[in-house]
Design a protein with these regions (language model features):
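Long, low-complexity N-terminal extensions
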Residues: 1-153
């Protein structure tokens, strides 16, 4: 099944729940990443049944700062390696954190899907080298405050 068909069916299901007062609408938006013969796709669904395709998107509490980061950087994504894309995702996630919360391997996970690869989740210890890398980059730029937690602290 093509990703666009899956998202259309899911959005239709969400929308049907808004048509009757006896059915409770879904109260959640989803980000759905797919890869098919036409390439990679990222869809966002809304509880109302609306859906959109994006090149990059963030949803949830405080997601506007993440979207701002993604809008500023998305033109470089096509030329990025998988490792660079993972670091961009973590930087976007870190941008949405409140001042007293830090990004660490216990509170973050990254989902990866692509051509010739099935969906996989990177979390816990395998995620730590990516977090360390973005912290080093942020230190070099002087922007490391509140970016990620130091695992040795």
């Amino acid at each position: 099944m093509q990703g666009s068909r899956l998202v259309t069916d899911l959005a239709d299901m969400h929308q049907r729940c808004t048509q009757s007062y006896v059915r409770r609408p879904y109260g959640v938006g989803l980000l759905i990443a797919t890869y098919d013969q036409t390439g990679p796709h990222l869809f966002m669904t809304e509880p109302s049944g609306n859906f959109y395709e994006y090149l990059a998107m963030a949803i949830g509490s405080r997601s506007q700062t993440s979207r701002t980061y993604l809008e500023r950087e998305f033109e470089s994504f096509a030329d990025c390696s998988l490792d660079e894309l993972i670091k961009h995702a973590l930087k976007a996630l870190a941008a949405s954190l409140s001042g007293d919360v830090e990004l660490d391997a216990k509170s973050a996970s990254i989902g990866v899907v692509g051509k010739d690869s099935s969906f996989q989740v990177i979390d816990g210890p395998p995620l730590q080298p990516y977090l360390d890398s973005i912290l080093v980059e942020a230190d070099a730029e002087g922007t490391s405050e509140q970016l990620v937690a130091d695992p040795d602290a």
